[in-house]
Amino acid sequence: MKKFSMRVVLIISVLFIALGNANVSIAQERDTTNKLPEEELGSLDTSNIIAEEVAQDKPAEVEQLEEIPTTDELMQNPDVLEKSVADSDDPDLTVVDSGAYWTIYRNTVNNEYSLRMFGNVPSSKPTAWNSYLKSIKHIEIEEATLTGNFASYFDNSAFPALESVRIEQCNLSGVTSFASAFYSSGIEKVIIRDNDYPTAPSLLTTQAMFGYANKLTELDVSGLDTSAVTNMQNMFQYCRALEELDVSHFDTSSVTTMRGMFQYCELLDKLDVSNWDTSSVTTMMSVFAECNSLEILDVSNFDTSSVTDMTAMFQNCYALEKLNISNFDTSSVTKMYAMFSGLYEVGKLDASNFDTSLVTTMNRMFQNCKSLKELDIGNFNTSLVTDMDRMFINCAALKSLYLDNFTTAKTMTDMFTGTTSLTYLFVSHNLSTFTGLENTSWYDEKNWVQFSNLSQLQTYHRKQSEPTGYRKGEFLSLTMDAMGGEFEDA
C-alpha cells in the first residue's frame, strides 16, 4: 500500500510541472475537481519518472518482509519447499510434524497423537517417526497407494499405544504381505474398506494379521482382496473380544492353509463361510477351535479333498448345535485328533461317509460330545491308526455306537470312559480292547450270552470272528413247560 501511494504522489507532481506553463488564469477558473482531458494525459511521458521511483530505496518495512517464492521457483528449487501438510477439518488438531506422504497431529483437547498418510506410501517407516511411535493412538490412510511388504507394520512393537487404524479409498494392488500386521496390538478398531485394485492383487499372506489382537472389538475387512492369498494361518487367532466378523466375501480359492484361522474367537456367535472355495486347502487344523460362542456355522459346501490335517478343527465349539459334515471328502486326511472334541450341544454327527484309510491319529476325536446320542462310524477304516486314547471319553448321552471296521490301536487309554448312557455297542472282531467301557452286565444280542462284567465281555469278544453287537444289562430267558412259560433272569 505504501509503495502504491508513493507512485501516485510522483505522478501527480509530474502533472503539475507539465502544466506549469499553462494559462494560470484559465487554470484558476477551472474546478479543481475536474479531471484533465484524456488527450492531455495520454501525451505525458512518465517512463523516466516511474523508472526513478522503482530505483528508489525500499522502505525499511518492506526490507524486513520475506520474499515469497513463485511457483516456478518452487519447482526449480526443492530446497524452498515446505514440508507437506495434510488438511484437517478438526480444529482441535495441531500439526507437530510432517513429510512427503504423512502428517502427525496432536489433539489439543486430549493430547492424543494421530498419524495420517496419503499419496505414495512405502512399507518402510521414516526415522522422523521414532520420537512419536509410543504416542500415536490413531492412524488414517486415505487416498493413498500402498506398495510392498507391510508385515508387522502396525503391531505392538511398532505402535504400542495404537487404538485404531483406518485404510480407506486406497490402492492396495501392490501390497504383498499383511502378515502379523496388527499382531499382539492393543488395537480396538480396524477399518479396511472401499479400497481399489486397479491391477491384479499381489497380497500372498495374511498369516496372523490380527493374531492376538485381543482388545479388537470392531473390524471391517470388506476392502481386502484375498484372491491371491495362499496363507491365512492364525489370521484372526485370539481375537477374543470380537463379537462380529464378516468374511463372507473372502476369495479363498488360492488358500492352502487355514490353520488356527479363527482359533479363540471366543465371542463370535456366527460366521458365514458357506460360499468359500476350499479346494486348495491342505490344513484346517484348529480353524474353528475354541470358538466357544459360535452357534451358526455352515461348512456343508467345503471341498476338503486336499486337506491332510483336521486336528481339532471344531474343538470346543461349545454352543454349536448343528454341524453338517456329511459331504466332507477325507480321503487325504492323516490326522483327526480332537476333531469334534467339546461339541457340547451337537446331538447328531453324520460321519458315515468318511474315508479314514490314511488317518493315523484319532485320539480325543469325540471327547466331551456331551449331547451326542448316536454315532455311526462303522465305515471308518482304522488300519493305520496308532492312537485312540479317550476317543469317546465323556460322551455321556451316547446310546449307540457302531464300530464295524475298527482295529486295535497301539494306545487306547480311556477310549470309552464316561459313556454312561451307552446301551448298545456294535464292534469289529478286530478291536479287542474296550478300555473305560462301563463295568457292568452286558450280553451278546445274537447268541444271548450273558456277561456280568467287562472282563468277561472282552474275553468272549476276542474269540469272535465277525463283528458282534452287545447290549447293556441282563436279558430275560423264557422257560417253557407243559403249563406254559415264564421269564427268568439270566
Model regions and ranges:
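Leucine-rich solenoid repeat scaffolds
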Residues: 401-475
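Low-complexity, acidic Ser/Thr/Pro-rich repeat tracts that form intrinsically disordered stalk/linker regions
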Residues: 3, 22-112, 488-489
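Structural signature of tandem-repeat unit edges
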Residues: 112-120, 134-146, 160-176, 185-204, ...
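Bacterial N-terminal signal peptides
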Residues: 9-20
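Small-residue (G/S/T/A) turn/hinge positions that recur once per unit in extracellular repeat modules
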Residues: 145-153, 176-181, 202-205, 209, ...
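Secondary-structure capping and domain/repeat boundary segments
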Residues: 475-490
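Bacterial N-terminal signal peptides that target proteins for export
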Residues: 1-9
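Short domain-boundary/entry signatures in modular proteins, especially
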Residues: 94-97, 134-135, 424, 472-479
